[in-house]
């Protein structure tokens, strides 16, 4: 009987050690690789320390944000306050795109940013959706004028993160979108709701340009933000990861799309995480600005982190305001959790 008890205890310990629990949340070192800290307020870095997170704050050329120069200033201020758990990506604009020397000016800016410690750059969807050249044509990411800039980044051993295109929902009417966070975003940002702008490049145009861009630069360390705008089907995303060994993706603001797919086929989504465990990076797209309420942002960030942890480590029945219907947590193995929450960020962004 004593031997049976010992064996059962060993089996129980082995099973529990193969997976994390919800209670392990604060014990595990984690990284959120997609934050926007556009303020000097330390609220989110303080929450990160409490929840055992390190952060990557991402500068980006967005009209709604302060300038990329001010974003970098905030990033460096935040890093000075929290040097052990915060790093950053820089960005550039397409101002003066058609002028002689545009690439040289961008490279000069990037050189300064890299000397300050930037781990790479972020490209945004205004490439392909907003910026036009002097001939009134949309500037797509595979345009050869980007090549010297990208080659410089590669030579510096830095990472290219890119939000190119949008969720496939962007080309649907609001009532046909699959997740509520997309429905809310495009209702509030009709300028980016491509269903309303059929004269703009199509979803396929955006994805094809991105694919040509990645194919053109096989030595580029590339992270497709937001599941690489292939959030609608993990099998479709898997095809790109198979084709491009230099590509990983973050999950920022697209975990609801994974949960939506989990409702109908949990095994498919879970197996995708296991099969591509080296290419998937945890991120939220959370942030703070100068007009934010720091206490509210801190609380929201903690709640987001907890809800995501439950989805990945447990097999509980869960709900989300972003998804219509219940879904079951994925209960991923411990080694997969370690990769998506920490090790992949270190590999793909060279985070410390």
Predicted regions and their residues:
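Sec-dependent signal peptide recognition
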Residues: 1-7
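Hydrophobic h-region of N-terminal signal peptides that target proteins for export
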Residues: 7-16
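Active-site gating/metal-coordination segments in enzymes
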Residues: 15-23, 72-193, 198-199, 255
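An N-terminally biased module of ancient metal coordination in phosphate/nucleic-acid-related enzymes
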Residues: 16-85, 105, 344
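Hydrophobic faces of well-ordered beta-strands that scaffold small-molecule active sites
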Residues: 31-35, 55-58, 86-91, 121-123, ...
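Acidic-and-aromatic substrate-binding clefts and catalytic sites of carbohydrate-active enzymes
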Residues: 34-42, 61-71, 95-104, 131, ...
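Active-site gating loops and adjacent loop-to-helix segments of metal-dependent hydrolytic enzymes
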Residues: 51-54, 85, 132-134, 168-198, ...
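H/E-rich (His + Asp/Glu) clusters that bind or coordinate divalent metals
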Residues: 198, 202-212, 217-352
